[in-house]
């Protein structure tokens, strides 16, 4: 059965780079469906880019997606090839460059500035939530925290931001805000939202 939100139909190849994928028993399905590498190095990105460019015109290259999971702060340095690739990946016929991290500030400024879509799950560290608000709150004109609370209330829910349009969603389906406007009537208290109080070390 073709799962994973139809990724096999959307892309000719999906490349997943993860330091921990072999420690996750549920990842066996990903390993069957996609190209999976254990870890990250700048050379991997260079090889992918060169391979894509070897097809000549962009339209002749395979349409690919790259997912980098849990690689930040380990093998990834500032000004890495991944950061550089973020500014030119569409020229290599890469339709998706997704980066998952548990440490927001470990993401290079270049990557953050070139992000068109942001997914934020419920945070357990107050300082990290503040950093995310500092980064993206201006787009939502002081309503970021309220949108976060509405979106992440409930198990497994997340806040999805479309930076180019200023739209905010609960998960992918329900639009809850746009720039400084909240489009739903519900309001969530800090206690109900489980806002973090731990600032970390």
Annotate the PLM regions.
Residues 1-13, 19-27, 33-144:
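Conserved P-loop NTPase motor cores
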Residues 153-201:
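Conserved P-loop NTPase motor module
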Residues 15, 33, 44, 53, ...:
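Generic alpha-helical secondary structure signal
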Residues 129-168:
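P-loop/Walker A phosphate-binding loop and immediately adjacent motor/lid segment at beta-alpha junctions
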């Amino acid at each position: 059965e073709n799962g994973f939100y139809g990724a096999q139909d959307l892309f000719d190849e999906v490349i997943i780079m993860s330091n921990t994928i072999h420690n996750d028993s549920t990842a066996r399905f990903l390993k069957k469906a996609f190209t999976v590498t254990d870890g990250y190095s700048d050379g991997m990105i260079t090889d992918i880019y060169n391979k894509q460019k070897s097809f000549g015109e962009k339209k002749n290259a395979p349409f690919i997606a790259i997912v980098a999971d849990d690689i930040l702060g380990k093998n990834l340095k500032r000004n890495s090839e991944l950061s550089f690739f973020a500014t030119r990946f569409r020229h290599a016929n890469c339709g998706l460059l997704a980066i998952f991290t548990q440490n927001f500030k470990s993401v290079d400024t270049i990557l953050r500035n070139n992000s068109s879509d942001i997914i934020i799950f419920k945070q357990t560290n107050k300082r990290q939530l503040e950093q995310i608000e500092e980064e993206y709150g201006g787009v939502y004109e002081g309503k970021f925290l309220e949108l976060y609370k509405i979106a992440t209330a409930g198990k497994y829910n997340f806040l999805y931001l479309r930076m180019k349009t200023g739209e905010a969603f609960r998960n992918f389906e329900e639009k809850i805000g746009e720039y400084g406007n909240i489009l739903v009537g519900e309001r969530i208290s800090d206690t109900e939202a489980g806002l973090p109080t731990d600032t970390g070390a």
